[in-house]
């Protein structure tokens, strides 16, 4: 699986925290980008593809962030957060959640990111691994938001990137599970085109002001736009 534009965009844009979960981490790109952007963060990446997890672990071990990034091979539906049964409500004091250790003890994350499977009704690719990575059969949107609701701290932020074809369905599923859309960024490839993908941030509570804007990746000369260059400057040589 190659490094994709969607992963680069989300890894450069998403809000971070002290304990970050990357759902569908693939080869570890977004996990590593979040670790680089947030030097104090502990990052956990989960994916159900064993080969992708193996490659992600190799990439993590070759990075400067090996002590802060962990890769687990499992489905979101089976992931326990910290391998413990405690919940945030079971902690004796709210102050315990003010550190990465407190979040881990509670089995929750204050930032979750995902570049989720997005093909809903299209024909499946004969390459089973590519199908798994791209088709919602492996992680329906309802299951994704249910998992995020279980694992996100009360004040945490969930960020995702989805193509324009499914953005309305994605937001609708978030509402059903009680989330509020707090930030929306449409991304055009070039100025004359309509947005092909949307980056979205959700919270468990309404947050003001709501942010919505559209950005362009490439300028008229085919170079990275000022916006794209700015958000990715620490990742590109």
Feature annotation, model-predicted:
Residues 12-84, 102-126:
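Conserved SAM/SAH cofactor-binding pocket of Class I
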Residues 87-100:
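Long, intrinsically disordered low-complexity tandem-repeat segments
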Residues 116-143, 147:
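Mobile active-site "lid"/loop adjacent to the S-adenosyl-L-methionine
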Residues 192-237:
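SAM/dcSAM-binding transferase cores
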Residues 10, 115, 144, 202:
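Residue-level signal for inorganic ion chemistry
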Residues 1-16:
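S-adenosyl-L-methionine
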Residues 3, 138-195:
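Conserved Class I SAM-dependent methyltransferase catalytic core
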């Amino acid at each position: 699986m190659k490094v994709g534009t969607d992963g680069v965009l989300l890894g450069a844009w998403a809000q971070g925290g002290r304990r970050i979960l990357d759902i569908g981490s693939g080869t570890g790109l977004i996990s590593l980008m979040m670790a680089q952007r947030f030097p104090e963060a502990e990052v956990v990446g989960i994916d159900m593809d064993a080969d992708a997890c193996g490659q992600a672990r190799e990439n993590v071990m070759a990075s400067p962030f090996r002590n802060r990034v962990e890769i687990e091979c499992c489905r979101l539906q089976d992931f326990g957060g910290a391998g413990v049964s405690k919940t945030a409500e079971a902690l004796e004091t709210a102050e315990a959640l003010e550190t990465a250790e407190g979040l881990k003890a509670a089995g929750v994350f204050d930032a979750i990111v995902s570049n989720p499977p997005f093909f809903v009704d299209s024909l499946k690719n004969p390459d089973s691994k590519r199908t798994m990575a791209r088709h919602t059969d492996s992680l329906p949107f309802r299951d994704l938001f249910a998992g995020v609701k279980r694992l996100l701290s009360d004040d945490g932020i969930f960020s995702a990137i989805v193509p324009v074809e499914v953005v309305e369905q994605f937001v609708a599923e978030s509402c059903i599970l009680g989330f509020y859309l707090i930030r929306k960024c449409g991304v055009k490839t070039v100025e004359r085109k309509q947005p092909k993908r949307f980056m979205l941030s959700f919270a468990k509570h309404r947050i003001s002001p709501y942010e919505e804007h559209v950005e362009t990746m490439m300028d008229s000369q085919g170079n990275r736009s000022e916006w794209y260059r700015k958000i990715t400057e620490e990742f590109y040589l």
